[in-house]
């Protein structure tokens, strides 16, 4: 995030590459090279920006949910000769590829085995890929236009010890990436995109916040408080510049 396109504060000192207590299912391949991963810098590491950006610079402020990063994307696909041959036997020809990814991998849709393991002292059990289950729950494959990727937070009863206190798998988008241009939509355009396509958006706490009118310590105190559900402590806030 060169000039604070994205800044983040969260209470954890380090972000894990893959959250514990989460069954990702059968890997299909590497994370797509044409989509950026979702890592974002912590604001404590960006103190120089208090001296390089104007104090009235405006940002969208959203909740930092405690779950696992999930990316869904759809690209154009040209059926092969083999695909066309299979179509004579009932195989449905598709003009697109839809992918579902964890933080580091694209996942196959057919993982359905059960695994039980320890998650920070609590037993966890999954019978299939949480990522594909959530994608199907929200019908993202049918809603997402070709040429776009949505990136968001997957939360659930056994993900991160259910920090957000939810009763089922839930998914909230925090970024929309235009694959054809190689650019993220601006915050306003992203919110419009999610509303238009009926895809859940991460809770927005301010659409024009000015973080650099605060000292770092005051900003850290500002982000303390409840998360999206009563009785849950917020993981922090994510700030994204309004025009980039």
What does each model-found stretch correspond to?
Residues 1-244:
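Core nucleotide-handling region used for phosphoryl-transfer chemistry
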């Amino acid at each position: 995030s060169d000039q604070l396109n994205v800044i983040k504060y969260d209470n954890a000192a380090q972000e894990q590459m893959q959250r514990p207590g989460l069954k990702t299912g059968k890997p299909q391949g590497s994370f797509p090279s044409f989509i950026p991963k979702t890592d974002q810098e912590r604001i404590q590491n960006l103190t120089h920006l208090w001296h390089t950006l104007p104090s009235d610079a405006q940002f969208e402020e959203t909740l930092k949910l405690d779950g696992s990063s999930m990316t869904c994307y759809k690209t154009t696909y040209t059926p092969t000769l083999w695909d066309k041959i299979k179509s004579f036997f009932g195989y449905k020809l598709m003009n697109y590829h839809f992918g579902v990814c964890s933080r580091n991998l694209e996942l196959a849709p057919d993982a359905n085995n059960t695994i039980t393991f320890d998650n920070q002292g609590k037993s966890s059990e999954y019978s299939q890929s949480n990522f594909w289950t959530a994608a199907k729950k929200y019908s993202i494959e049918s809603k997402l236009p070709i040429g776009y990727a949505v990136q968001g937070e997957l939360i659930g009863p056994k993900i991160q010890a259910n920090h957000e206190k939810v009763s089922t798998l839930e998914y909230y988008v925090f970024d929309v990436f235009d694959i054809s241009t190689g650019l993220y939509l601006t915050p306003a355009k992203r919110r419009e995109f999610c509303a238009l396509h009926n895809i859940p958006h991460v809770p927005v706490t301010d659409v024009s916040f000015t973080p650099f009118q605060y000292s770092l310590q005051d900003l850290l105190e500002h982000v303390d408080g409840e998360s999206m559900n009563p009785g849950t402590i917020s993981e922090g806030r994510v700030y994204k510049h309004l025009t980039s």
